[in-house]
Amino acid sequence: MYRALTHDIEVTVEPYYLEEQSDPDDSRYVWGYRIIIANHSDVAVRLMTRYWHITDENGQVDEVSGPGVIGEQPLLNPGDTYEYSSGCPLDTPSGVMFGHYSMEAEGGETFNVAIPAFSLDSPGLVRTLN
């Protein structure tokens, strides 16, 4: 698992390879990821937007942004957690994702919360280091 803590908001990511949705012969590799957002602060916050920076093993970058996550803009009161799952297809057997959520505190303050960088690696992938 991968974790980041920003402004007392913790983001935990657990990626997993979706073999049944992948087709390596057609250069299609798909991962799912489970995210848990925990509000360790003493104020309520709402997740307003998301931003993803996705890089495949060839260095091809895809940026994704938009309102909320999976169609929701969840409100997290102090001590609350919010969990969701989503996915990411790539044309290569590995890649890396990271990003941030834009949050709004109950007083109207907005701030970004880091989504930690995490690796997308196909099972059985052999890496060679020079």
Swiss-Prot record:
SUPFAM superfamilies: ApaG-like. Residues 3-127 form the ApaG domain. PROSITE patterns: APAG (PS51087). It holds the Pfam family DUF525. HAMAP family: ApaG. This is Protein ApaG.
